[in-house]
Amino acid sequence: MLLERLSTHLAVVFAMLTSLTANADGGTLESQLRSAAENGQAAQVRSLLDQGAKLEARDKMGRTPLLLATHNNQVEAARVLIDAGADVNAKDSIEDSPYLYAGARGHNDILKLTLAHGADLSSTNRYGGTALIPAAERGHVETVRLLIAAGVAVDHVNKLHWTALLEAIILGDGGQRHVDIVRELIKAEADVNLADGDGITPLQHARQRGYKEIQVLLERAGARA
């Protein structure tokens, strides 16, 4: 009986020491994985996965290791995670996913990886927008091209009643990047007369802001005021 109790006691002590050692070494395998992913330590990410770290282990904000890697545009770490089967559509508490975030931020290398591994083109962010809409707003020309080529709906309307075309005009600066984006959207057959929630058309918005080049593009495409 005494030996049994001693054995049980030693087992408990061993478990506590193991836990303390893990914390001293940087926490659980999962917390180490998230940190390695966020900091672009691709070899460490691979090692932790080999040790059994859970691929989709989330932090308090619901962010997976892949989303954390995407936040910092850590391409190689993201590649290791995606090759291991990480979910490119897993959303956090504010409805960002690796695919949506890469598109919104113009992280094109990671975006290409997500597109090649099952990105849900119809998924939307907390504003009800596809990846194309914030990409258009922020002037990410190549990202817009990638998303159009992938098949994202160009006339999707978000919760603000804006399309990618409207957002490129309303929140853009009228400079060359946004001119190029408007051109790409028109080439993709975006509806140039699809108005916002107040009935204001893309052409009217362009005129109000004095965006001459965008006005010309819209008018040539058949836009009405």
Spell out what each predicted region is.
Residues 193-225:
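Leucine-rich solenoid repeat scaffolds
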Residues 47-77:
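N-terminal, post-signal-peptide region of Sec/Tat-exported proteins
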Residues 35-40, 68-74, 101-107, 134-140, ...:
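Ankyrin repeat A-helix N-terminal signature
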